[in-house]
Amino acid sequence: MQGTGHPVRPVLELLLLLLLLAGVGGSTTASTPGPPLFNVSLDVAPERWLPVLRHYDVELVRAAVAQVIGDRVPKWVLALIEKGALKLERLLPPPFTAEIRGMCDFLNLSLADGLLVNLAYEYSAFCTSIVAQDSRGHVYHGRNLDYPYGSILRKLTVDVQFLKNGQIAFTGTTFIGYVGLWTGQSPHKFTVSGDERDRGWWWENLVAALFLRHSPISWLLRTTLSEAESFEAAVYRLAKTPLIADVYYIVGGTNPREGVVITRNRDGPADIWPLDPLKGVWFLVETNYDHWKPAPEEDDRRTPAIKALNATGQAKLSLETLFQVLSVVPVYNNYTIYTTVMSAASPDKYMTRIRNPS
């Protein structure tokens, strides 16, 4: 949502910001733990995740897989995937299925379970994403990822630097055992996050779309980070590629006005909403609802985020203040697994913090 552009007197601005941040509980980037950081080389075999997996308790990862599948996957889907796992493996795009198979072999999981847990994570990811431009034209991007099973997933959250030819090709935040990305950065090119767009009948749509060779949401995000050479190329790919489900893609670039929220249907874009600072639209806030519709009263994270951004002000926007905005309750809540702030023009400042670590 855009800034109002209304001037706020300095004292009132400070008081309002302090009130909005009162629910943060003193949370700062310095006092909040970050996840482990690993390198994954895309130049080696699909078993490339094994050096990372060796840092984790296999039983913890297996327990997470069992819990997510047990709670999130209907029995009819489980039976269908178990019967058709090998066929599905051939239909889905490389390198993802080969990576999943490599993980399954190491973790002693069936291929069906590996595929299902990766698909289950595509569902029920309630999130807040913000892309914003400061008064000097710098673009910042932040996101909270909210998800159940926090007691396990916080222990399995990692930052990953994906390497090509020994160099960092892109960076992302994910869970151990999950090959997709909901959050990532291509250095000096663009940043991207994904927020779920719940349209109902999710598993039916997913199964039908899979057999049409449509892409899982998080796999397209990772592929775009790997292959798109510019902000514009990323937006085009994310807007046009057929998907297994609806989603919001939030993209930030390196130049002024390079920021959009793409509202996706499975077959293409429903809406593309750009930054327009010259008209007062210096930030965009996307949760899990179409931006042109009112947020539901029972889950309005949008309005508190907008108030916090306006209280912060465009001139004071930074990665640190964006982190504070994402720490305002209920933008930050009991389901928040992690917060990431990033700016493609300053890729070394990519930062993830685990939330609710206790």
Curated annotation (Swiss-Prot):
Q: What GO molecular-function term can you cite, just one?
A: fatty acid amide hydrolase activity
- Family per record: Belongs to the acid ceramidase family.
Keyword annotations for this protein, in alphabetical order, are: Autocatalytic cleavage, Fatty acid metabolism, Glycoprotein, Hydrolase, Lipid degradation, Lipid metabolism, Lysosome, Membrane, Signal, Zymogen
Q: Lineage of the source organism?
A: Eukaryota, Metazoa, Chordata, Craniata, Vertebrata
Q: Where is the active site?
A: C127
Q: Which GO terms describe its biological process?
A: fatty acid metabolic process; lipid catabolic process; N-acylethanolamine metabolic process; N-acylphosphatidylethanolamine metabolic process; sphingosine metabolic process
Q: What is its EC number?
A: 3.5.1.60, 3.5.1.23
> Where is this chain's protein located in or outside the cell?
Lysosome; Membrane
Free-text description of this protein's post-translational modifications in UniProt: N-glycosylated. Tunicamycin treatment causes a reduction in specific activity against N-palmitoylethanolamine.
Site described as Important for enzyme activity, positions? R143, N288
**Name this polypeptide is given:** N-acylethanolamine-hydrolyzing acid amidase
Oligomer status and interactors: Heterodimer of an alpha and a beta subunit, produced by autocatalytic cleavage.
The family database entries (InterPro entries) matched by this protein are listed as: Acid_ceramidase-like, Acid_ceramidase_N, CBAH/NAAA_C
CDD domains cross-referenced by the UniProt entry: Ntn_AC_NAAA
Mainly localized where?
other
Where is the signal peptide, in residue numbers?
1-26
Q: Does the keyword Glycoprotein apply?
A: yes
* Summary of the function given for this chain in its UniProt record: Degrades bioactive fatty acid amides to their corresponding acids, with the following preference: N-palmitoylethanolamine > N-myristoylethanolamine > N-stearoylethanolamine > N-oleoylethanolamine > N-linoleoylethanolamine > N-arachidonoylethanolamine.
